[in-house]
Regions:
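Active-site and donor-binding regions of nucleotide-sugar-utilizing enzymes
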Residues: 1-137, 153-161
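Active-site donor-nucleotide binding/catalytic segment of nucleotide-sugar enzymes
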Residues: 139-176
Length: 176
């Protein structure tokens, strides 16, 4: 976004944590301070709307604060309340004016709880094909037909990569 003229108030790496683990605990004070300071800054600037992108453990609290002060809030990437921690729907109701959903079944879950929601689709849906030819992939990667293929997708967060690095390296030499 910085390449497109947006100003970053904090480097995104400071918030690139996942879940609730030791990394988050070690950085809790810093993350909490960023969220508090961001809220203070937004309340002083009074934007027409705040759009929180994913990161519900960070954004929902911030959105609740902004919404309580009369700032419209939109959340992009619905938390997976249909899979786990469904009780978050109540916090979402207090925090979000409108939820933008990646999956077509999600808006109904929100509508049933009085929350405006719109299915917007997944950003990768038009990029990743629904069907692929295994043979074409094997040819492109020059893999023999009977060669086992294993995909490991560790994510992009530094903490996740560090946690899984030994496993990834060991997997490179694994025999299946």
């Amino acid at each position: 976004m910085a390449e497109h003229g947006f100003e970053a108030w904090w480097p995104y790496q400071k918030l690139a944590v996942h879940g609730f683990n030791m990394e988050v605990l070690r950085r809790f004070r810093e993350i909490w301070t960023i969220r508090r300071d961001l809220g203070d800054r937004l309340l002083a600037d009074r934007p027409d709307v705040f759009v929180g992108v994913d990161a519900p453990d960070f954004n929902l609290g911030l959105e609740a604060r902004l919404k309580a002060e009369g700032i419209k809030t939109v959340h992009f990437v619905s938390p997976s309340i249909w899979a786990w921690r469904g009780g978050r729907i109540h916090k979402i109701h207090r925090s979000v004016d409108h939820m933008l959903c990646l999956f077509p079944f999600e808006p109904k879950l929100y509508h049933d709880h009085g929350i405006a929601a719109t299915f917007v689709g997944h950003p990768l849906a038009d990029i990743i094909p629904l069907q692929t030819s295994k043979q074409a992939v094997r040819e492109k990667l020059a893999l023999p037909r009977d060669y086992p293929v294993f995909g490991m997708l560790p994510g992009s967060r530094q903490g996740e990569l560090a946690m899984m690095a030994d496993f990834i390296i060991a997997g490179d030499n694994a025999k299946f």
